[in-house]
């Protein structure tokens, strides 16, 4: 399987390139960066699967090109909140090929998300909810894709279990607030925290990344799944790279 990386000159693109070059199961194909030698069309044409580690500002262009020449995609880029156009293009592409959407490819982040949804169903609205994330000073996204995903699963769980609407930055009788905080400092690879806080206690779910290699390894798990399972076209999440159901 020939793998092409979109955003190949960035931090994660460079790391994944090194890891792919050290394996025998995959072939590192031509990658794309804005200052690179290959056009986006040629990168799509000359690879069997694409991994997107670029930026949310490039997603529209990439997905439009893929709709003209569909190839399986691991979409590991932050997806803006309420990005209807991007969502629509991802769903259209998934009609033709497998599309795995995972803004965070680490195993721990996936488990944290599932546990956060569980706790949102357990604790009622006497528990306030806070989501906080910290990344290195060079990260461009004002809010990480992982934090957006955490907010989304918390809102969904509250709606389904308690029939209560939650949102970021809103607090009225009908809509409860989720506090969302982001910091860009130092060289932090990634830290996400979900806290449920009442007048009498709090419980905190915290996931900390010590090495960005965990994201590259998670991407390899998903690539392994694509080879081993030969999945039909469809819209998939990061759970496809896990060996067990969580």
Curated annotation (Swiss-Prot):
Function of the molecule: Catalyzes the conversion of 4-hydroxy-tetrahydrodipicolinate (HTPA) to tetrahydrodipicolinate.
InterPro entries given in the database record: DapB_C (IPR022663), DapB_N (IPR000846), DapB_N_CS (IPR022664), DHDPR_bac (IPR023940), NAD(P)-bd_dom_sf (IPR036291)
Keywords of the record: Amino-acid biosynthesis, Cytoplasm, Diaminopimelate biosynthesis, Lysine biosynthesis, NAD, NADP, Oxidoreductase
Keyword Amino-acid biosynthesis: yes
Protein name: 4-hydroxy-tetrahydrodipicolinate reductase
Binding site for (S)-2,3,4,5-tetrahydrodipicolinate: 136, 145-146
Subcellular location(s) of the protein: Cytoplasm
Pathway: Amino-acid biosynthesis; L-lysine biosynthesis via DAP pathway; (S)-tetrahydrodipicolinate from L-aspartate: step 4/4
Binding site for NADP(+): 34
Organism phylogeny: Bacteria, Pseudomonadati, Chlamydiota, Chlamydiia, Chlamydiales
Family: Belongs to the DapB family.
Listed GO CC annotations: cytosol
Gene3D superfamilies: Dihydrodipicolinate Reductase, domain 2, NAD(P)-binding Rossmann-like Domain
